[in-house]
């Protein structure tokens, strides 16, 4: 029982700390996303993405591919398009947030909801193939078409495996949930989420 109580306290402290940390980046995320998408873009989802990616911590991931910063960008993969847009590196937080918005703009497919764009950012273009197989821009129907492998992780000697479909499709749900915590999301037909 004590362990459960301590776990609840830890989770609530972590979540509260994440909320405060992320709040300090809201205006920078807004500026970065509006510079790429225009002022109708619901930038709150960009903040939600930082919550999902790093808990708004400027960290180097242990993912094995070199993802770094608040938005967990693998710079070596995005170096050329980012440099073309004036981002020479992502060591500074302002550059990380600019890079996040630039990447989001480059993977955005305007005929689909933003959920698909966030999933492309997270897991590549497979979601676009799943939408095509489903024949409709619908999260649930696209997920039904998902046929991916698993990712396995070992932590403290315990191996855990998860479906890559579950990981990628939960990602867009989390962005939606977390984004709503950073102000009223003003959706438009141009930038609908679902």
Residue map of PLM features:
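Short Gly/aromatic-enriched secondary-structure transition segments
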Residues: 64-66
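Short alpha-helical scaffolding segments that buttress acidic/His motifs in well-ordered protein cores
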Residues: 46-50, 118-121
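Short hydrophobic/aromatic-rich motifs at helix boundaries and adjacent loops
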Residues: 18-19, 49-51
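Sec-dependent N-terminal signal peptides
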Residues: 3-13
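Short glycine- and hydrophobic/aromatic-rich loop-to-beta-strand nucleating segment
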Residues: 71-73
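Conserved alpha-helical segments that form or flank metal/cofactor-binding pockets of metalloenzymes
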Residues: 50-62
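Non-catalytic cell-wall polysaccharide-engagement segments
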Residues: 13-39, 56-57, 75-194
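Extracytoplasmic
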Residues: 42-45, 68
């Amino acid at each position: 029982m004590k362990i459960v109580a301590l776990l609840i306290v830890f989770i609530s402290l972590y979540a509260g700390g994440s909320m405060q940390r992320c709040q300090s980046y809201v205006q920078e995320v807004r500026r970065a996303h509006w510079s790429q998408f225009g002022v109708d873009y619901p930038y709150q989802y960009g903040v939600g993405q930082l919550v999902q990616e790093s808990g708004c911590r400027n960290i180097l991931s242990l993912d094995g591919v070199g993802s770094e910063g608040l938005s967990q960008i693998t710079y070596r993969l995005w170096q050329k398009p980012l440099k073309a847009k004036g981002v020479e590196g992502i060591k500074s937080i302002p550059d990380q947030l600019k890079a996040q918005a630039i990447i989001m703009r480059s993977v955005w497919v305007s005929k689909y909801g933003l959920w698909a764009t966030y999933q492309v950012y997270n897991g590549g273009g497979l979601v676009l193939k799943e939408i095509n197989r489903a024949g409709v821009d619908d999260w649930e129907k696209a997920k039904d078409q998902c046929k991916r492998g698993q990712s396995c992780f070992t932590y403290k000697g315990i191996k855990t495996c998860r479906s890559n479909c579950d990981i990628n499709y939960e990602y867009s749900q989390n962005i939606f949930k977390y984004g709503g915590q950073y102000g009223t999301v003003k959706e438009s037909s141009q930038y609908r989420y679902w």
